[in-house]
Amino acid sequence: MSHNSFGHLFRVTTWGESHGPSLGCVVDGCPPGIRFTLAEVQHWMDKRKPGQSRFVTQRREDDIVKVLSGVMLDEDGETMTTTGTPISMLIENTDQRSKDYGEIARRFRPGHADFTYDLKYGIRDYRGGGRSSARETAARVAAGAIARKVVPSLNVRGALVQIGKHKINRDNWDWDQVDQNPFFCPDPEMVPVWEEYLDGIRKSGSSIGAVVEVVAEGVPAGIGAPIYAKLDQDIASSLMSINAVKGVEIGEGFASAELSGEENADQMRMGNDGKPIFLSNHAGGILGGIATGEPVIARFAIKPTSSILTERLSIDTDGNNVDVRTKGRHDPCVGIRAVPIGEAMIACTVADHYLRDRGQTGRLK
């Protein structure tokens, strides 16, 4: 199985499976001299880790990160400085229960990668989905923690903006609320609605989809490239690589089809400081594949978790018609924990483009 790496200069390779002894990543191309602490990496890991509320999988993983290479420890015993060599990070699996998946060893879960993995490779890891499990994304979040340090002033924040048909009221958007509830929800009025709704979904043994929005501020103007290396192209690609993601939009996205040219165009003026300013940001911070300096805004849609308790029609590896009901511990809405994953992927993509731009133009933005 190939294609386990992404990025060009800031290149991330992830490895490991959902029910293996461990998983991790190798970050290649990180510049020397980047300083960080394990606590800073762990902060982002803790946002993603399972078992933190009744609305996510009850699998209990501490997701403690170990840095194995690519750094030197400072005299304070906490701060690490990158040396420019590959940074390898490891996360141990401690709460896998493979016996829960015995009944689907030869059965394909509808909506899951079971069928296509078996079709392509002739073998699949049915224990939690192997590489197709969202467990793999823990390694991406670890890599994203390093990426955030590469670009000066970069601030990447995400929020859940829709669960099922229930959307937030954008007039109530408050970033301070995002870490105050189990949904990463910026609208405090929507929290009790989602709680009641997801309790019903969870008790029925079903699942539901969601939409995540990520905003990256401090993205240097001018990074990116035209045609085949657009910043928005690579952001879309990175987000689409996340498990269960079925759609991505940048800026106004699909809603721009409803706008006129006058409404959609981001008008400009010169500011009092002699720098250009945009009067709107329908483009989501990117024009012609190149960052404008405005916040980069992306949204991605996540399908409902395929592993559900409701019986569904399928087939087995012998070609028999069967009914499938998945046991085990699963997210009733995988979109909740996708928030820090989306943040990490955009951080890695911006870091990669930042280094590529620096190498091509020599500018330190």
UniProtKB/Swiss-Prot annotation:
It is an enzyme of class 4 (lyase). Pathway: Metabolic intermediate biosynthesis; chorismate biosynthesis; chorismate from D-erythrose 4-phosphate and phosphoenolpyruvate: step 7/7. Keywords: Amino-acid biosynthesis, Aromatic amino acid biosynthesis, FAD, Flavoprotein, FMN, Lyase, NADP. InterPro entries: Chorismate_synth, Chorismate_synth_AroC_sf, Chorismate_synthase_CS. GO terms for biological process: amino acid biosynthetic process; aromatic amino acid family biosynthetic process; chorismate biosynthetic process. PANTHER family: CHORISMATE SYNTHASE (PTHR21085:SF0). NCBIfam families: aroC, PRK05382.1. This is Chorismate synthase.
